[in-house]
Amino acid sequence: MTNNSETQTKASRTDALIIFGYRVVSRVTKILPPTAVAVVTAIVVPIICVFLRKQRPIVARNMRRVSPELRGFKLRRAVSKSYQSYARYYIETFRLPNLTKKNIDAKILVSGFEHIENALNLGKGVILALPHLGGWEWSGRWLIHQGHNLNAVVEKLDSPALFKMFVDLRKSYGVNVIPLDDKAGVAVQEALYKNEIVALLSDRDLQGNGIEVEFFGERTTVPAGPAFFALRTGAALLPLGTYFAKGLDQHETIVRPAVDIQRTGSLRDDMSRVAQDLIREFEILIRKKPEQWHLFQPNWPSDKIADVN
């Protein structure tokens, strides 16, 4: 009983420290001039490296999935760049609520927006399927500024306070947040039936009940949601990648053409086909800038075996 109490107390203190750190970085990056934000980034990167030090082998494995030739110094440099990119994600996301439409428009280059417009013209909604790549939050803010309703399904965190902080952050710039729980499916379909946009981070199977695919040469599972909702509602399924570009707040977004969701067999077979086609698109997007792929958790069966060993 005492051990459980001590563990809970320690976890609560850790959560409080993390939340405090996030809030400090959030407030500082909002008021500092662009030249000073680089200093904050330099401070934040080592902190993230400490908190996520156990994830370095996983990040290295992911870098080698994309670029098997990476070894030694080049691999270590790729891993370090991934941590730097992750720090930049948080810093530039925290800056979003205080930036104007003019600021956002000037800082992001979007290719393939016509795929979203054409899909919305069909009246069945749009599913934007994303890997954890670059500064994806910026694409959401930009879409909202174009006059579109954006819904995002988000993972519930172990810390309710931390989860609320990020929900409030996204709501502050117009995102309708759908928590990933037993009500999420209904909320997603309602949004699509209203011809809205739903964003789904789709390269990690959080619930462990996804669809088996081949992803960078190894079998694993990915979320069933994108394929299921697209086939169920007829909503267009569009892969999207957002990348950091050179310079503070500079981003590039690429919207790929819609994945084919035409029914050809059973629902199960069609879901498998659509999920695999989507992952092939993710591989294209990730290969463009693999060091910006923020996947710091085991995602393949071999990751879990390596972690145990």
Model region roles, listed by residue range:
Residues 2-6, 10-13, 32, 51, ...:
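Non-catalytic C-terminal accessory region of glycerolipid acyltransferases
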Residues 2-130, 172:
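Membrane-anchoring hydrophobic helices of lipid-metabolizing enzymes
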Residues 103-108, 155, 174-180, 216-217, ...:
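Short, flexible loop segments at the rims of nucleotide/cofactor-binding pockets, characterized by
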Residues 88, 122-182, 208-215, 244, ...:
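Catalytic core of membrane glycerolipid acyltransferases/transacylases, capturing the structured
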Residues 24, 36, 59, 139, ...:
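Hydrophobic alpha-helical segments typical of transmembrane helices
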